[in-house]
């Protein structure tokens, strides 16, 4: 997990 991602509304690595 990187941080909270608003694009998928989950804790992941979205958009680097």
From Swiss-Prot:
The cysteine framework is III (CC-C-C-CC). It is found in: Secreted. This is Conotoxin ar3b. GO terms for molecular function: toxin activity. Disulfide bonds join 1-13, 2-11, 7-14. GO terms for cellular component: extracellular region. Expressed by the venom duct. Transmembrane segments: none annotated. Belongs to the conotoxin M superfamily. Coiled coil: none annotated. The keyword Ribosomal protein does not apply. Keywords: Disulfide bond, Secreted, Toxin.
């Amino acid at each position: 997990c990187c941080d909270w991602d608003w694009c998928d509304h989950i804790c992941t690595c979205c958009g680097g």
